[in-house]
Structure formats: structure tokens, C-alpha cells
Amino acid sequence: MLRVVEGIFIFVVISEXVFGVLGNGFIGLVNCIDCAKNKLSTIGFILTGLAISRIFLIWIIITDGFIQIFSPDIYASGNLIEYISYFWVIGNQSSMWFATSLSIFYFLKIANFSNYIFLWLKSRTNMVLPFMIVFLLISSLLNFAHIAKILNDYKMKNDTVWDLNMYKSEYFIKQILLNLGVIFFFTLSLITCVFLIISLWRHNRQMQSNVTGLRDSNTEAHVKAMKVLISFXILFILYFIGMAIEISCFTVRENKLLLMFGMTTTAIYPWGHSFILILGNSKLKQASLRVLQQLKCCEKRKNLRVT
């Protein structure tokens, strides 16, 4: 029975990885075509970076998970766990700061506040976003340097060999330190999400006072952005839960089923949010519909040739 359940989990994880690569690859491809036509916008640049970083993150999640499931002893020899930790931090942090940039972009473009600083930033969104991306990148690099020091100190402490039988509390503390930068970016995204909710509530109250009874384009934009940001927050919480399960399984290696469940939960975030972005972005949605129409036409042609 366990073998069957394990097989189901492995199938689900592989399917998530395939969907994740296809979804994020589609986002990246559409925006790269726009870049070739010199039509790449700020949002297009952010989505391209987010797609590439998430493809990288998916491969790290799958590689790390399968090594822990099928060849856990490999971690005990050499520096593999150190290299995977570095790659995971790069993929995780780059994915988060692109996602945070996307949240800030939605906030500046859609939200309505009378605050002078907000209005100044809103009028210069296309100038502010590049500086914001650079700021997030620099903070990621500084955090990465701190992470490298943590990993190096821990490695030296254990005589250049990673001790898999470390105290659980010490291992969890190390993982919390590794995720400090990600938690900071996620907090920024949550703050922008809360401000968008406040802006939507105030806008709806103004619309009700006008007694129009119709949803204007501003309300639609608010709702669409809220769906993307709330789904991001929910999926990222699931991602964190999955990571916590995987970390706990790292210290207790007997429970493979729990590890597979954690890996399945973790992989939902990078592939699920990509499809939400496709459905929430009019350009990506239209491009996906055109692709589906082309696939249907190809299928009809094949059927006609067979008959």
C-alpha cells in the first residue's frame, strides 16, 4: 500500500514540475518575443525574471527532494548539501524579489491614496521599479554573503564534513537564518496586499456613495490584482509549510512518505502561481488562447489526414 502511495506522490511531483516548467516557460517566451520586438515593458521584465527564477527553483526542489528520497547517503559524502543549499538560496531569493517587485508594481499602478509620497511614487512608477529591483537585488546579495558565512562556519565547525546527525534545534535555527531574506520580501508583499485591500474598500465605498451600481475599470483592476496577490500569499504559505516538512524530514529520514508530501506541497507554489499570472494578465491570457487554438487546429488536421 505504501509503495502505491509513494508512486502517486512521485507522479504528482513530476507532474507539478512539468506544469511549472511549461507555465513559467510560456511566460518567459511571450515576454522574450516582446523583447525581440522592442516592446518589453516593466511588468514584462519582472514576469520574465520571475519565470526564469521559478524554473530554476523547481529544478532545485525536485533534485533535492529526489536525492533525499532515493539516495540520502550522498549528502553525507562531499559538499553536495552545501552546493544545493547555495543554489536553493539563489533560486528562492531571486524568485521572491521578483514576486515582491510584481506586488509593488501592482500597488503603485492600481492603488489610490492621497498621500503625497505615494502620489510622487505612483507618477514615477517606471522609474521607481528599476531602483526597487536593484535595491532588492543588493539586499539579496548581502543576505547571500551572510548565508555563505553561516554555511562556511558550520562546515568548518564539523571538520569540513556535513554532520547529518546534528542537533535538531541547531539545524532549524540555521534554516531560519537562511530564510530571513525571503521572510523580509514576503512581508513587503503582504504589506502591499493589505494596502491594496484598503484602497479597494475605499474605492467601493466611493462607488456606493455615487449609486452607480456598476463595476468600473478601476474596481476590476483592483479585484484582478487582489486575486493575484492573495493567491501568491496563500501559495507561498503552502510553500513554507512544505519546506518546514522537508526540513523536519531531513533530521528524521525514516519517514519518506512525509518527505514526499512536503515536496508535493512545496512544488505547488512555483507552478500554481504561474498559471494564475497567465489567467490574470490579458496579454498572457490571449497568447495562451491563441496557442490552444493552434493546437486544436493541428489536431483537426491530423484527424482529417487519418480519415
From Swiss-Prot:
It is a multi-pass membrane protein. GO terms for molecular function: bitter taste receptor activity; G protein-coupled receptor activity. Pfam families: TAS2R. Glycans are attached at N92, N158. It comes from the Eukaryota. The chain crosses the membrane at residues 7-27, 43-63, 101-121, 127-147, 180-200, 228-248, 258-278. Keywords: G-protein coupled receptor, Glycoprotein, Membrane, Receptor, Sensory transduction, Taste, Transducer, Transmembrane, Transmembrane helix. It is found in: Membrane. GO terms for cellular component: membrane; plasma membrane. Residues 1-6, 64-100, 148-179, 249-257 are extracellular. Residues 28-42, 122-126, 201-227, 279-307 are cytoplasmic. Belongs to the G-protein coupled receptor T2R family. PANTHER family: TASTE RECEPTOR TYPE 2 (PTHR11394), TASTE RECEPTOR TYPE 2 MEMBER 10 (PTHR11394:SF63). Receptor that may play a role in the perception of bitterness and is gustducin-linked. May play a role in sensing the chemical composition of the gastrointestinal content. The activity of this receptor may stimulate alpha gustducin, mediate PLC-beta-2 activation and lead to the gating of TRPM5. This is Taste receptor type 2 member 10.
